Amino acid sequence: MLNSEHFNLIQRALDATANELKELGTDSSPSVISHAQTDLEKAVEHIYSTDHPFLSSHVINRK
């Protein structure tokens, strides 16, 4: 089961990816950026989903 340290590492990785996507905005094709941003948004939503079998108890405790 993931503990809060693992959860925080995942969140930092997602935040770093979001920042990298913003920086790449003008250097990459719009479709590549769009797909990457969509994937990132889905990953963030998945982390906060109470249906997630490994994170549900952690997310409930964070709310």
From Swiss-Prot:
The keyword Signal applies. The keyword Signal applies. Keywords: Signal. Residues 1-18 form the signal peptide. This is Uncharacterized protein YptA.
